[in-house]
């Protein structure tokens, strides 16, 4: 039987070349190395402790009291109080919009009897009668609404702090009036607030309206003491103006430089083009079944102009957080079904790894302050026809998601020939219209983007935006930063393994079942297993050696070793009693079944849990005590042999991993049975259990006590044709007792006869087993 290859891998040993040991150490061993050469040492490594260099702080802190500023004429901003510190009598300020607002404030010193005084206001000599009988200064707000009218005293502020204020806000001009320390604000209407300018004849300050309480405090109580010293020199208002220097759209800026290294900030536009990859697998058979429709990573290379310079870019698009859907139109071989198709929705993410040939990516090893800003894009699915042999074709159509930028990190992007240090842009998803459906089925009005046709005929999807990063690079631009450990032997091996896994999985539909049964009956050994590989005898031996070494560490080998030791210990101390309890104690070495049978039989859930545990270990017993019937491992080894022969990507360094994975992952859903007289007891890895009669295939109660007695001393048989398939076969076609008995025993000759007769139910069952041979 083909499963002999697994037993050989478990028991045989091969000589090991020194070259194999060295190669294994180089690919698997890791070591932490600390390099501490100092910041200026002559080394090809970057300084171990490198700082951020000079940082341009762009944080703006708005002062509460900004000033003092020298007398000037300007248009004050809205939402800011102008606080004027008057130091003499006469005109304090003039303000107008030349349409409906003219105002001037004149200061009158204390103890002034009524008197006519001349004032120069807006270029005109005006005479006002003023007086002040208090100990405080008076500030008279003179107002007119037209250039033809005369000024009149609209409001007065009596103050001992000699401060007045004016504010443009909410379509009105606000000033203070009353007497300090209880002065309050009042306002005047105007239809043209924005054009009001002011000529100030004294020093002044600027206070944001958000700090109006402080302005009120200053008006009523005076300025802080620090503002009243001779060391405070008023500045020109122009010093408050910021000289804006707009950064170039695409610009490289040197931030800091120390000897061998410098920090460069790269700011640039970016155009990201990407496409989704997908894989559609249709198994053999009558042509009504699809086993998988899935997303896979897709590369895309393109050119575009950035600031007049042509850039060559490379992207890799992948998805994470996929949702698995399925459609089952029935259990007959001619019923349309899709075992699994993938859909991305709100809980999914799309990753786009981006690299281009610009300077920013040349030395992308030591990077900080990585940021990006990208727009969103909508991805709409197209149509995919399920071309069934007879009848109207079902069609998967529609579906849409919108991608929204959610972050950026560094990544390593693998191409066919080289690994590139890249930027990984992460996008969150929201579902969008239209919904998707499978026409002529019950699947309608579902939301998300299915993997059947995610690009909808588009060559690519495009996202534009900007990115910025600071990179530590050599001061001499001719030097290349060493890319330490960005590409290792193991990473390259993982890429090869990924490609090989995809190829192996896609080969499932190319396996002819009649040839598979014949191959499963052959006693495959090391050299016949690998004979299909184009190589010399020496290389085949070397491959067998590598596979043997890898297989020794597999879960299967470890489980068999532990089971053998456990049985050996149990045999040396086992009681000769034939009671139920002693039988359960013996079976516990196989199954870990509880000693307390009553606890096991309390509920169906307990039985399900125990039978699931038992079934996973029955494989080991079947492997050690081979029966005449065909086993799941025979099919697994035959499929592995067939795929190795058909593969174009098998390498010496990838074969051991593939064989190990195949032994553990091929056919995860297995059923095993035990025969006693005319009764069959069957359990599977999903925890389901059946007991039935051979003659009628009618179910009978499943007796756990009886099962635990039988499993120790009775051969275990792989249920190649499981109970569900047997019932379907008998109900639709009818089978004799002899045929049923041979199918229950997994007789390979009977299986071959059914397959040669192209029996749809048996073929469908074997197809499902082949489809489970996936990595």
UniProtKB/Swiss-Prot annotation:
Gene3D superfamilies: 1.20.5.170, 2.60.120.200. GO terms for biological process: permeabilization of host organelle membrane involved in viral entry into host cell; virion attachment to host cell. It comes from Rotavirus A (strain RVA/Human/United States/P/1974/G3P1A[8]) (RV-A). Residues 247-478 are annotated as: Spike body and stalk (antigen domain). Residues 65-223 are annotated as: Spike head. A motif (YGL motif) lies at residues 447-449. It comes from the Viruses. A motif (DGE motif) lies at residues 307-309. In group A rotaviruses, VP4 defines the P serotype. Some rotavirus strains are neuraminidase-sensitive and require sialic acid to attach to the cell surface. Some rotavirus strains are integrin-dependent. Some rotavirus strains depend on ganglioside for their entry into the host cell. Hsp70 also seems to be involved in the entry of some strains. Disulfide bonds join 317-379. Belongs to the rotavirus VP4 family. GO terms for cellular component: host cell endoplasmic reticulum-Golgi intermediate compartment; host cell plasma membrane; host cell rough endoplasmic reticulum; host cytoskeleton; membrane; viral outer capsid. The record marks 230-231, 240-241, 246-247 as: Cleavage. A motif (KID motif) lies at residues 643-645. Residues 509-775 are annotated as: Spike foot. Residues 388-408 are annotated as: Hydrophobic. Pfam families: Rota_VP4_MID (PF17477), VP4_haemagglut (PF00426), VP4_helical (PF17478). The keyword Disulfide bond applies. This is Outer capsid protein VP4. Residues 483-510 form a coiled coil. Keywords: Capsid protein, Coiled coil, Disulfide bond, Hemagglutinin, Host cell membrane, Host cytoplasm, Host cytoskeleton, Host endoplasmic reticulum, Host membrane, Host-virus interaction, Membrane, Outer capsid protein, Viral attachment to host cell, Viral penetration into host cytoplasm, Viral penetration via permeabilization of host membrane, Virion, Virus entry into host cell.
């Amino acid at each position: 039987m083909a499963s002999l290859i697994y037993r050989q891998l478990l028991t045989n040993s091969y000589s090991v070349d020194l070259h194999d040991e060295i190669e294994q150490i180089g690919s698997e061993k890791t070591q932490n190395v600390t390099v501490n050469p100092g910041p200026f040492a002559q080394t090809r490594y970057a300084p171990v402790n490198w700082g951020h260099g000079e940082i341009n702080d762009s944080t703006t802190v708005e002062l509460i009291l900004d000033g003092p500023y020298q007398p000037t004429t300007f248009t004050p901003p809205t939402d800011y109080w102008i606080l004027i510190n008057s130091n003499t009598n006469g005109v304090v300020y003039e303000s107008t919009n030349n349409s409906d607002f003219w105002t001037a404030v004149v200061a009158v010193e204390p103890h002034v009897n009524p008197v006519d005084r001349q004032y120069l206001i807006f270029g005109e000599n005006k005479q006002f009668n003023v007086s002040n009988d208090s100990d405080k200064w008076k500030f008279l707000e003179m107002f007119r609404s037209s250039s033809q009218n005369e000024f009149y005293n609209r409001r007065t502020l009596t103050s001992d702090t000699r401060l007045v204020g004016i504010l443009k806000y909410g379509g009105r001009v606000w000033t203070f009036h009353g007497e300090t320390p209880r002065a309050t604000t009042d306002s005047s209407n105007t239809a043209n607030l924005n054009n009001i300018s002011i000529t100030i004849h004294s020093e002044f300050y600027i206070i944001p309206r958000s700090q109006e309480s402080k302005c009120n405090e200053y008006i009523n109580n005076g300025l802080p003491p620090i503002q009243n010293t001779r060391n405070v020199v008023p500045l020109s208002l122009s010093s408050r103006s910021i000289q804006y220097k707009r950064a170039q759209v695409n610009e490289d800026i040197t931030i800091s430089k120390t000897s061998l290294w410098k920090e460069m900030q790269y700011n640039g536009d970016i155009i990201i083009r990407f496409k989704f990859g997908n894989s559609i697998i249709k198994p053999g058979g009558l042509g009504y079944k699809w086993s998988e429709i899935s997303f896979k990573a897709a590369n895309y290379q393109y050119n575009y102009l950035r600031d007049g310079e042509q850039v060559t870019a490379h992207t890799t698009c992948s998805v994470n957080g996929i949702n698995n859907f399925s459609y089952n139109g029935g259990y007959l071989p001619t019923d349309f079904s899709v075992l699994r198709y993938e859909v991305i929705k709100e809980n999914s993410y799309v990753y786009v790894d981006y690299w281009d040939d610009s300077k920013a990516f040349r030395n992308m090893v030591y990077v900080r302050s990585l940021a990006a800003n990208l727009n969103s894009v909508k991805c709409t699915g197209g149509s995919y026809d399920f071309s069934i042999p007879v009848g109207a074709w079902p069609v998967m159509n529609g579906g849409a998601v919108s991608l929204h930028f959610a972050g950026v990190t560094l990544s390593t992007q693998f191409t066919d020939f080289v690994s590139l240090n890249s930027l990984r842009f992460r996008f969150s998803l929201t579902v969008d219209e239209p919904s998707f459906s499978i026409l002529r089925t019950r699947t309608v009005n579902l939301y998300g983007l299915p993997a059947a046709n995610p690009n909808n005929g588009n060559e690519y999807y495009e996202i534009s935006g900007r990115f910025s990063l600071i990179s530590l690079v050599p001061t001499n631009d001719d030097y290349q930063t060493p890319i330490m450990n960005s590409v290792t032997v193991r990473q390259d091996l993982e890429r090869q393994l990924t490609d090989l896994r995809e190829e192996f999985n896609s080969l499932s539909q190319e396996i002819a079942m009649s040839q598979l049964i014949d191959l499963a009956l052959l006693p495959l050994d090391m050299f016949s297993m690998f004979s299909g590989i184009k190589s010399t005898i020496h290389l085949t031996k070397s491959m067998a050696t590598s596979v043997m070494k890898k297989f020794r560490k597999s879960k299967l080998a470890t489980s068999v070793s532990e089971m053998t030791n456990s049985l050996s210990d149990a045999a040396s101390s086992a009681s000769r009693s034939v009671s139920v309890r002693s039988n359960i104690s013996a079976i516990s070495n196989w199954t870990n079944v509880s000693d307390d049978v009553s606890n096991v039989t309390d509920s169906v859930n307990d039985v399900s849990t125990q039978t699931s545990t038992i079934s996973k270990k029955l494989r080991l017993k079947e492997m050690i005590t081979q029966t005449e019937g065909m086993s799941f491992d025979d099919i697994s080894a035959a499929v592995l042999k067939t795929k190795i022969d058909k593969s174009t990507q098998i390498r010496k360094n990838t074969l051991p991993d593939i064989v190990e994975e195949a032994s553990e992952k091929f056919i995860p859903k297995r059923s095993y049975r035990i025969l006693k007289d005319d009764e069959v007891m069957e359990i599977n890895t999903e925890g389901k259990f059946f007991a039935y009669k051979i003659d009628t295939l009618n179910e009978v109660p499943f007796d756990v006590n009886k099962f635990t007695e039988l499993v120790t001393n009775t051969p275990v048989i792989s249920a190649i044709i499981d109970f569900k398939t047997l019932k379907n076969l008998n109900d639709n076609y009818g089978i004799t007792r002899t045929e049923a008995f041979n199918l229950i025993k997994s007789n390979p000759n009977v299986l071959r006869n059914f397959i040669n007769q192209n029996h749809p139910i048996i073929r469908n069952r074997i197809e499902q087993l082949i489809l489970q041979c996936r990595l």
